[in-house]
Amino acid sequence: MSHYDIIHKPVISEKAYAGMERGVYSFWVSPNATKTDIKSAIQKAFDVTVVGISTMNVRGKRKRVGRFIGQRADRKKAIVRLAEGQTIAALEGQA
C-alpha cells in the first residue's frame, strides 16, 4: 500500500489546529492501516521523524435526506506526534 493510499487528508478542526503548535498533527487515514503503516507513510510523505501515534475509529453519523435515513462511512483518525522542533510545512500555513 502506497503512502498516498494510507493518508487521506488532514483533520480540519480547532482542536487539530491547537495541536499543531505543539507538534501534534491529526490525519484521516485508511481504516485498514496499522500504526506502523501510518508512521512510515507520514515520515516518507513529509520527511519528518514521528515519535508517537494514537489512532481511533470514528463511527459514521446517521444522516437524513427527507424521509430516508442513511449513514456516513466509518473513518479512522490518527494523531501523530513529531520529534521536538519539527513541523510539517505544508500544513503550517493552514493554521
From Swiss-Prot:
One MF annotation (Gene Ontology) recorded for this entry: structural constituent of ribosome
Keyword hit for Transferase: no
A cellular component annotation (GO) from this entry: ribosome
Disulphide-bridged cysteine pairs: none
Classification via Pfam families: Ribosomal_L23 (PF00276)
Database matches in InterPro entries: Nucleotide-bd_a/b_plait_sf, Ribosomal_uL23-like, Ribosomal_uL23/eL15/eS24_sf, Ribosomal_uL23_CS
GO biological process: translation
Keyword list, A-Z: Ribonucleoprotein, Ribosomal protein, RNA-binding, rRNA-binding
HAMAP family on file: Ribosomal_uL23_B (MF_01369_B)
Function: One of the early assembly proteins it binds 23S rRNA. One of the proteins that surrounds the polypeptide exit tunnel on the outside of the ribosome. Forms the main docking site for trigger factor binding to the ribosome.
Assembly, per entry: Part of the 50S ribosomal subunit. Contacts protein L29, and trigger factor when it is bound to the ribosome.
NCBIfam families named among the record's database cross-references: PRK05738.2-4 (NF004363), PRK05738.3-2 (NF004366)
Family: Belongs to the universal ribosomal protein uL23 family.
Protein name: Large ribosomal subunit protein uL23
Species, as recorded: Deinococcus deserti (strain DSM 17065 / CIP 109153 / LMG 22923 / VCD115)
Lineage: Bacteria, Thermotogati, Deinococcota, Deinococci, Deinococcales
Primary gene name: rplW
